[in-house]
Amino acid sequence: MPAIKDWPEDERPREKLLHRGAEALSDAELLALILRSGDAASGHSALDQGRLLIQQFDTLRQMATATTSELQAIKGIGPAKAAELQAVFELARRFGRNPLRPGDRYTSPQAVFAHFHERLRDHKRERFIALLLDSKNRLLREVGISEGSLTASIVHPRDVFAPVVRESAAAVLFVHNHPSGDPSPSREDLDITQRLREVGELMGVRVLDHIIIGDEGYVSLADRGVL
């Protein structure tokens, strides 16, 4: 197989990222950029090495918690590459533990997922959080609304919008986790989101999104057309 440098430019992971953004790359392509080189002994490219890592570990989370010895068990992964992988995953964990700060601007569901994934993914109960935003989508305050099964009796519009009024927020964004690990919205999720949207409209407060966090991904109800 030809080396990555000999591929058509629009197929090379680095050029693809520069032209289309990191979101356009597969997990294997992102890993290839971290690894930078393949295994000369086997003739594997960096992309091949990325695919081998994905085959060995069922999920990125398992890969992120692997020891250097476990990473080096993959052909072509030596101490240097194992250390680079662990450094990247540790940075991701530290980023995920950093709370959003007042003044931080809401930019995308992906950014919210990146901030809350590490905090919420291991919780055994559902946590419902409201992010209160100003007219420029900058964070005013993060408010914990409830903990437990998500039902209308636990997430009441009065409890949600009282801090919105106190902070004079122009918009609000909701985040909650699914302990099952599957971020697919339940009927209750959809019903509560619709109810909160209607109350927000009456109060002149924009409900920007409701983002559900799972083990390996998220669902944005705004992207789904619910909001």
Curated annotation (Swiss-Prot):
UniProt GO MF annotations: metal ion binding; metallopeptidase activity
Gene3D superfamilies according to UniProt: 5' to 3' exonuclease, C-terminal subdomain, Cytidine Deaminase, domain 2
Cited Pfam families: RadC, UPF0758_N
UniProt KW rRNA-binding keyword: no
Residues bound to Zn(2+): 176, 178, 189
Source species, domain of life: Bacteria
One of the GO BP terms on file: proteolysis
Residue ranges annotated for the MPN domain, each copy included: 105-227
Sequence motif JAMM motif, location on chain: 176-189
Alphabetical UniProt keywords: Hydrolase, Metal-binding, Metalloprotease, Protease, Zinc
PANTHER family (UniProt xref): DNA REPAIR PROTEIN RADC, UPF0758 PROTEIN YEES-RELATED
Family per record: Belongs to the UPF0758 family.
Protein name according to UniProt: UPF0758 protein Pcar_0065
Organism per entry: Syntrophotalea carbinolica (strain DSM 2380 / NBRC 103641 / GraBd1) (Pelobacter carbinolicus)
Native organism taxonomy: Bacteria, Pseudomonadati, Thermodesulfobacteriota, Desulfuromonadia, Desulfuromonadales
